[in-house]
Amino acid sequence: MKRVFKKALLGALTVGILAGCASEEDTIVMAPLPQVDSQFTPSSEWSTSIGDGVGHYFSKLSPVMANDTLFVASRDGLVKALDPENGKQKWQVNLEEDVIARLSGGITAAYENLYIGSENGEVIALDQDTGDVIWRIEVGGEVLAKPIADSGLIIVNTSRGTLIALDESTGEQRWALSTEVPNLTLRGDSTPTAIGGGVFWGTANGRLAAAIVERGQLIWQQPVGTPKGATEIDRLVDVDSSPIVLGGTLFTVGYNGQLIAIDLRSANPIWKRNYSSATDIATDGSRIFVITEKDHVVAVDARSGTELWENSKLEYRQLTAPVLVDNYLVVGDTLGYLHWMDRSTGEFVAQQFVDDSGFAVGPTLLSDGYVITTRNGDVKKLTINE
């Protein structure tokens, strides 16, 4: 199985992408930095670092808050517990053994532990209080998506198309469920969502799948995209976005597919709209926010699927998944800027340069601010001064 990156090389303003099987070269041009009259300037409360961060590698490692502690990690295996008030270190541990740890999926905080996946095909459980390794298990495939916790289980989606449930305290495998993986897929996997005794996740073959959490029995699969075109690249239909639940409706989006709303009880589609994306979506309860494959930011009415607004001024700036901060929608880009938009209109309200290494993930919310992590490992707590 070959895996390809879904966006242009980091830091390049103009990138030629060669589709080998088609022998055609398409030029992707990054939009210039929008001119924004910022209504506020976020201020830094403290700053620290977490090793070398994730570098230029594909990674969705995100900080997580639990038990009044902020946990951060780097790709090479460094994990730290920080005081969110001042950034001071409580403990740190290095998970690198004979080879680089290549942490990539996480961090998840549950059952008084931390759970992190790796490109080496491991899931690692750490004690939240000490950083001690509780267990370390191989799962037979890269873990690029964040593990989730439900019903005493840690559920991971691997790059080989296998959803695996592990005992939260021992790491023992409880069940595994495999789905078909095409020869060519995007680099990335869907973080599952668990609710009401079910687990829902996107697959590499263009489907949203549902299973019973306790025993891993497949309930249904709903197409999100159908392979089309003459080349393998044209036929990519990965559903790498994490499903979100709003009331009795499940939402997800696929690459070369659709944004789809599905009734949780019947598994029937409520509406479908033609948006292509491999990035997580967000909701504020009434709207669904999508980053398209061209890095257009779109707001859609959750009930009807009607497009409310579209902001195309960040085209191909390799945006993070959208995050809701206060009354704003925030995305980071590959050149190290945070862009703040009005949720109702999509208009820019602020812009902030942080670090030219860029962002792999968006901000993590705290009770009194938010934390950002850059690709080179900078960790900063920011607050909004309006």
Task: Mark where each language-model region is.
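Extracytoplasmic beta-rich repeat domains
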Residues: E25-A31, V36-V64, Q92-T108, I134-D150, ...
